[in-house]
Amino acid sequence: LEKKITEFLGTEDTILYSSCFDANGGLFETLLSEPDAVISDELNHASIIDGIRLCKAQRFRYKTSDMADLEAKLKEAARARFRMIATDGVFSMDGSIARLGEICELADKYSALVMIDDSHAVGFMGKSGRGTHEHRGVMGRVDVITGTLGKALGGASGGYTSGRKEIIDFLRQRSRPYLFSNTLAPVVAAASLRAIELISSSGELRERLMANTRRFREGMAKLGFQIKPGEHPIVPIMLGDARLAQSMAARMLEKGIYVIGFFYPVVPQGTARIRVQISAAHSEADLDFAMAMFAEAKSELGL
């Protein structure tokens, strides 16, 4: 499975973990120490945030996808031995895609490493489904990619870190979640291998997923919902108020649609939302039913 992921992502080597949370938790502490610096997007996943907390490197945080602020932080960290830029490939609460092309340009300019957590992209983003680095045209320029086997690559559990061979070799020797935890169950590895084979053999599922995403996004906009713009299958329906998000989620469950309301501290105050995740397994009838139920709930809540 490690070899197959390496081939699929176009990297040099891969190491498996029991989860992507463990992959991120075992990365920064292993690679970075006091003389180093990590520059992290402010909307990064909790696992990146917690992983960075475990290391002793200098920490800088830049405004999300703000390249001017990222450059300013790289300059602030000029005296660091090594600098690493850390970002989600796709931000899980927004469905927005990192500006990896510009990030890689800045990394080249300031001799920094680039790390992405691509859990919400590998398997369907990019021409061949390889993820954000393929989607943004920077394959071969990202030093470290972490990801999960719990979404498009099998839907069960497990995670990985993939990238430059010297980095992966070092993780095998020093990364605590790898050394002191269990490996994947064989059935999970087999399912993930099969998932990669399916993704590699045909683009049909990716095309269906993107068609479903367009249908749902366009339909919800016509119904008057405020959704964050984009092309990703994560579709945030912005409601603002935490109680409203909870009420909407409860109404939808009563109508046979399971969605979750997110609010502070998971998202910033005043930006409560329902996060919908579209699948290639959804039929047009499924999507139309979901939109009809959203319209009913919207009317019942007086929106």
Predicted region positions:
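Short loop-beta-helix segment that forms the pyridoxal 5′-phosphate
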Residues: 2-26
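PLP-dependent enzyme catalytic core of the Aspartate aminotransferase-like
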Residues: 7, 254-257, 266-303
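Conserved PLP-anchoring active-site segment centered on the Schiff-base-forming lysine
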Residues: 27-46
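Pyridoxal 5′-phosphate
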Residues: 32, 63-67, 79, 83-89, ...
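Active-site phosphate-binding strand-loop segment of PLP-dependent enzymes
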Residues: 60, 64-116
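Active-site C-terminal subdomain of aminotransferase-like
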Residues: 110-113, 120, 125-231, 244
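Conserved PLP-binding catalytic core of the aspartate aminotransferase-like
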Residues: 207-216, 221-256, 266, 270-271, ...
